[in-house]
Amino acid sequence: MARVCQITGKKTRTGNNVSHANNKTKRTFAPNIQKKRFFLSEENRWVTLKLSTKAIKTISSKGLSAVLEKATAAGYLKKY
């Protein structure tokens, strides 16, 4: 799988490096993706996800089940 967050759908974007002389060259902006394990208490099992750091903060505030349901409904997550 590519560098894509399974919860927020964040992925690599393109942009420009801009020098002091205003010369522009293409570059990529990669999201901060981490591989993280969470315990899904409803199913009594561990789930491994590739997440952006913002998604990790969202899970810690809203809860794993709610975030997984929303990501599945949005189409970012096929199976967990």
Curated annotation (Swiss-Prot):
Q: Which InterPro entries match?
A: Ribosomal_bL28, Ribosomal_bL28/bL31-like_sf, Ribosomal_bL28_bact-type, Ribosomal_bL28_sf
Alphabetically list the UniProt keywords.
Answer: Ribonucleoprotein, Ribosomal protein
Where are the stretches annotated Disordered?
1-23
Would the keyword Ribonucleoprotein turn up in this protein's UniProt record? yes
Q: From what superkingdom does this record's organism come?
A: Bacteria
Q: One of this protein's Pfam families, by short name?
A: Ribosomal_L28
Molecular function (Gene Ontology), one example? structural constituent of ribosome
Gene Ontology cellular-component annotations? ribonucleoprotein complex; ribosome
Q: Does the keyword Ribosomal protein apply?
A: yes
Q: List GO BP terms, alphabetically.
A: translation
The Swiss-Prot or TrEMBL record describes its family as follows: Belongs to the bacterial ribosomal protein bL28 family.
Supply the NCBIfam families for this chain: L28
Protein name in UniProt: Large ribosomal subunit protein bL28
* Originating organism: Cytophaga hutchinsonii (strain ATCC 33406 / DSM 1761 / CIP 103989 / NBRC 15051 / NCIMB 9469 / D465)
Q: Taxonomic lineage per UniProt?
A: Bacteria, Pseudomonadati, Bacteroidota, Cytophagia, Cytophagales
